[in-house]
Regions:
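C-terminal (or distal) subdomains of carbohydrate-active enzymes
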Residues: 1-273
Length: 273
């Protein structure tokens, strides 16, 4: 998949293994039912004034005949490049052939550049050949670090929002949308921090992607998803790179212009033990 399965700082702390991978690109195809769910949940009805919006909240009932289905897709490594000084490697990822045959608009290629720095790692994700389609889709960059200790060693997953840092993603009132968080546009990000050892932390800063989703749920239209049970840091989190699921005067074809068929997202990983 191109994800990192070994990441350590020092001899004592390992942040990744085969069951806890970081920096995994995931393309998600959505079913017709999922495409309709946002409209049902948002419950917005302007009386049918505009023909593209039905009272049921579905963008287009004709999608039901497309065979659209819900699935998480992971790319595979096609080629690996390395700088002569060994400071960076570039992973060239290709999509599954089955995904392409379904007619979704997944990027034709994804490049992930990993660059080691003195106290951090820079990650550059670039995709090429993104096709504009009406089929419901979303793209994610997932991080599921290995959190040391059992569940009694409480970990906190926090985010940086505009004007305030380190907001606990589990401390959200009911019906407030705990499933999706906006980030501060200036070096905002997310941090996994040990409750018993606050100096032990894994942080990912996002320079371009402004939305993150905690836990395993990626149904971002279900703003009540964590009302009964908050997201668990052990389940990781992901940055939302793009989505066309919204029916609130939001662009449903992406890319809207051909120049955006190539997109770039930058991240910085910092780990403290």
């Amino acid at each position: 998949t191109g994800a990192i399965s070994s990441f350590s700082k020092g001899e004592e702390t390992s942040w990744a293994d085969k069951d806890h991978q970081i920096s995994a690109f995931m393309y998600r195809s959505h079913s017709f039912e999922e495409a309709c769910q946002y409209g049902h949940t948002y419950n917005y009805n302007h009386g049918g004034e505009y023909p593209y919006k039905t009272p049921l909240g579905c963008q287009d009932s004709g999608l039901n005949t497309t065979g659209a289905r819900s699935k998480r897709w992971y790319y595979s490594i096609h080629q690996i490049y390395r700088r002569d000084d060994h400071s960076s490697i570039v992973l060239n990822l290709n999509p599954p052939s089955e995904l392409i045959s379904l007619g979704y608009g997944a990027p034709a290629s994804v490049y992930i550049t990993l660059t080691a720095m003195e106290a951090s790692m820079a990650i550059d994700l670039t995709w090429e050949g993104k096709r504009a389609v009406f089929l419901p889709e979303s793209s994610w960059f997932e991080f599921t670090p290995k959190l040391q200790g059992d569940l009694s060693n409480r970990w906190v997953l926090s985010v940086d929002k505009m004007g305030k840092e380190n907001i606990d993603t589990s401390d959200v009132v009911a019906k407030a949308g705990a499933v999706l968080h906006g980030l501060d546009p200036v070096y905002g990000g997310m941090t996994f921090r040990s409750g018993s050892e606050p100096s032990q932390a894994f942080r990912v800063e996002s320079l371009d992607a402004g939305l993150m989703s905690p836990g395993y749920v990626r149904n971002t239209w279900n703003f009540e998803a964590y009302d009964g049970s908050p997201a668990r840091p052990q389940d990781g989190a992901a940055f939302n790179l793009h989505s066309n699921l919204y029916t609130t005067n939001y662009v449903v074809y992406y890319p809207w212009i051909q120049e955006d068929s190539t997109s770039r997202f930058r991240f910085i990983i910092r780990a403290d033990s």
